[in-house]
Each structure stands twice: as structure tokens, then as C-alpha cells.
């Protein structure tokens, strides 16, 4: 019986010792569904914002959105920052042929285009932002050279790793 209790306590102690520790987000980042997110209130062109996200955190990119739940979470996150302007996300058409890709390389299957979008207005809109007029819930293709606030997304890091 004593051996059983010792073995059980050993298993509990090992599981609490940091092995398999819960992933964490950096201070100032918000977590949801296994990812970390941060809204940056800095004006950047789409490509500069993507580069910033990559440099800010290991594995970071402009945000990719894969569900209505994630879209609602992001809309609330942006709302809490009192942002009244469009915000860059990680969707673009790199070849300028209307084939949309996420900057993190993830699959493009969920969409939330605003009515009439994408429209490639003046044949010059190949990057995508959340539209403020829709409560940041719908997407619009926009000129990549426009400067906007943006949202970065990254995998959380395990405790003890350096971000």
C-alpha cells in the first residue's frame, strides 16, 4: 500500500513540476483557443506590419482568422483598444491574381468579406483589413501601402522558453 501511495504522489509531483507546463502569452498579449494575439496601435503598411509581427515574437505573423468564434474574439479585442479605423490582418493576394493567402501559411477556408468585397478598387487592393464600419467583423481588400493599425498572432510558448 505504501508503494502505491508513493508511486501516486510521484506521478502527481512530476506532473506539477513544470513538465508539460501550460503555454503562456507574453504580458500585454491576449490568449484564445491556444493562440496569443496583440493589437498594435502603430501605423504600418501591410508588409511592414507583417515584418514587425515576425520580429516581435517567434512564429509571429499578422493574424489569420479561421472561425466565426475567432473573428468575434478579435472584434472585441480591437474594440477594447478604442480603434475606430480599419486594422490589417494577415490575408493578401501576393501574386495580385485574386488568390488569397494567409501570411502564416495556414489554409484559407473561412471568409468574412463585407458586402461587395473583395472589389480590387482601382485595381490596387491586394491586402485585407478588418473594416471598422462593421465593428471589425468583416473584411475588405485594401491598398497594401495604406498605413493601419494591425493584429499579430503567435503560438504560446511553454513556460521557461524565451519569447
Swiss-Prot record:
Q: What is this protein called?
A: C-type lectin lectoxin-Lio2
Subcellular localization: Secreted
Q: Which SUPFAM superfamilies match?
A: C-type lectin-like (SSF56436)
Show the PANTHER family listed in the entry. Answer: MANNOSE, PHOSPHOLIPASE, LECTIN RECEPTOR RELATED (PTHR22803)
Please list the GO terms describing molecular function.
carbohydrate binding; metal ion binding
Q: Which segment of the chain is annotated as a signal peptide? A: 1-21
Q: Which domain of life is it from?
A: Eukaryota
Provide the alphabetized UniProt keywords. Calcium, Disulfide bond, Lectin, Metal-binding, Secreted, Signal
Give the matching Pfam families.
Lectin_C (PF00059)
Cross-referenced InterPro entries: C-type_lectin-like, C-type_lectin-like/link_sf, C-type_lectin/snaclec_domain, C-type_lectin_CS, CTDL_fold
Cellular component annotations (GO), alphabetically ordered: extracellular region
Q: What is its main location?
A: secreted
- Family assignment? Belongs to the true venom lectin family.
Q: Disulfide connectivity?
A: 25-36, 53-152, 127-144
Report if keyword Disulfide bond is assigned. yes
Amino acid at each position: 500500500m505504501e508503494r502505491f501511495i508513493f508511486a501516486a504522489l510521484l506521478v502527481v509531483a512530476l506532473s506539477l513540476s513544470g513538465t508539460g507546463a501550460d503555454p503562456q502569452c507574453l504580458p500585454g498579449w491576449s490568449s484564445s483557443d491556444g493562440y496569443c494575439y496583440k493589437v498594435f496601435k502603430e501605423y504600418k503598411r501591410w508588409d511592414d506590419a507583417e515584418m514587425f509581427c515576425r520580429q516581435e515574437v517567434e512564429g509571429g505573423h499578422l493574424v489569420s482568422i479561421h472561425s466565426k468564434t475567432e473573428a468575434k474574439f478579435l472584434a472585441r479585442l480591437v474594440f477594447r483598444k478604442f480603434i475606430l479605423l480599419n486594422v490589417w490582418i494577415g490575408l493578401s493576394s501576393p501574386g495580385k491574381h485574386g488568390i488569397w493567402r494567409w501570411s502564416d501559411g495556414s489554409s484559407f477556408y473561412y471568409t468574412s468579406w463585407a458586402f461587395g468585397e473583395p472589389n480590387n478598387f482601382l485595381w490596387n487592393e491586394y491586402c485585407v483589413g478588418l473594416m471598422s464600419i462593421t465593428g471589425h467583423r468583416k473584411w475588405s481588400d485594401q491598398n497594401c501601402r495604406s498605413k493601419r493599425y494591425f493584429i499579430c498572432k503567435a503560438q504560446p510558448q511553454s513556460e521557461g522558453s524565451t519569447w
